[in-house]
Swiss-Prot record:
Pfam families the UniProt entry points to: Ribosomal_L24e
Zinc finger feature spans (C4-type): 6-36
Keywords: Metal-binding, Ribonucleoprotein, Ribosomal protein, RNA-binding, rRNA-binding, Zinc, Zinc-finger
Family label: Belongs to the eukaryotic ribosomal protein eL24 family.
Gene Ontology molecular-function annotations: rRNA binding; structural constituent of ribosome; zinc ion binding
Keyword Ligase: no
UniProt GO cellular component terms: ribonucleoprotein complex; ribosome
Protein known as: Large ribosomal subunit protein eL24
């Protein structure tokens, strides 16, 4: 089986766990938890600005290097 990554926080999702969400346009989003799904779908939050996501930490590293 193929391990997936969460579309919001960037964590790896083990096979048989997580949530697969399909948008009306056919885009498939994978979530590791209901917390990630609620933040992205329900609250329309962007992972860049949420402190506990991998994308936020990667951008923070880039900012502190410069």
């Amino acid at each position: 089986m193929l391990a997936r990554t969460c579309s919001f926080c960037g964590k790896t999702i083990e096979p048989g766990t997580g949530i697969m969400y399909v948008r009306k346009d056919g885009a498939i989003l994978y979530f590791c938890s209901n917390k990630c799904k609620k933040n992205m779908i329900g609250l329309n939050r962007v992972p860049r600005y949420v402190r506990w996501t991998n994308e936020y930490h990667e951008l923070k590293k880039m900012r502190t290097r410069s």
